C-alpha cells in the first residue's frame, strides 16, 4: 500500500495469506473460551448444542449471569404453554407456544439446574408454592457441586420446608432473604436450619418470621445485617455479640431481633462501657438527626475506637444500629 502524506499516521495493511488463517478446530482451547466470552447468550446457547466439543467449551466458560428469576406459575389452569413468542404483523399477532410433558415448575427448576452447569449465577430469586415428589427427586439427584446463587438468594415459599431444600445449592457468603409466599402463621425455620455453614457465613439475613435459632447459633453468624424473629435467643447472646463488636471482631450495620423473651437493657449491656447519650450525639456527624428521633434514655451509644453503635431495647425486641447504617 502506498503511503499517503495526508494521513496522520503512516501504516501498511498486510493481507494475510489463506495458509495463515487458523480454523476454529485448530485454535487452542483457552483462546476458544476467550472468544466465546464475547458471544451473545442466545448465540452461545445454540453453539452449545452443535457438538460435544462445543458443549464442553461452553460449560467450561461459566458465563456471568447477575440475576435469575423463577416464577411459580402453577396457579394457572393451562400448564403446558409456558413460553409465548409474539410477533406483530400490522394489526395481527402471531403466537408460538412451547409445550412440555411435565409441569412448568419442574421444567423451570430443571432449566435452572442446567444453567448452573455453565453459568456463574450471582443472584437467584424464586417463588414456589410447593414441591411435588417429582420436583423433590430432581433436587435430590443434583450433584453436590451445584451452585445456583453466589451473592444472593431470595425465595418466597409456600412452606418453610422448601427453603431447606435449596440451602445446599448456595455458596457460603450468599445473602439470604426468605419470605412466606402469603401470610402464613405456621411458617417456621427450625433449629437445624441454623446449623448450616451457608447460614453462618451469610453477610445478610432477612427472615421476618418466627425461627428456631438459639443463642449458640446466632453468635456464630457473620452477618452485618440481621432481621429475624428469634424467641429462643436471650440477652446473653446479644451481650456477647456487642462485646465482639467492641473488640473489633464483628461488623454490625443493622440487627433487628424480634420476638425476644422479656429482655432488659441491663442484661444486654452487662460489662459494656456506655458513652453518655448527649456526648455520643456530639461524636457522630448526624447526631442532631438521631437526637430528634430518640428521646433521652431511649438510645444507648457505644464506641469501639473505630465505629459507633446505637442500642435500642424494648421488652420483646432489640436493635443494634450503626448510626451511619446503609442498605447493602
Residues covered by each model-derived region:
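Non-core capping and flanking segments associated with repeat-based/extracellular domains
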Residues: 1-328
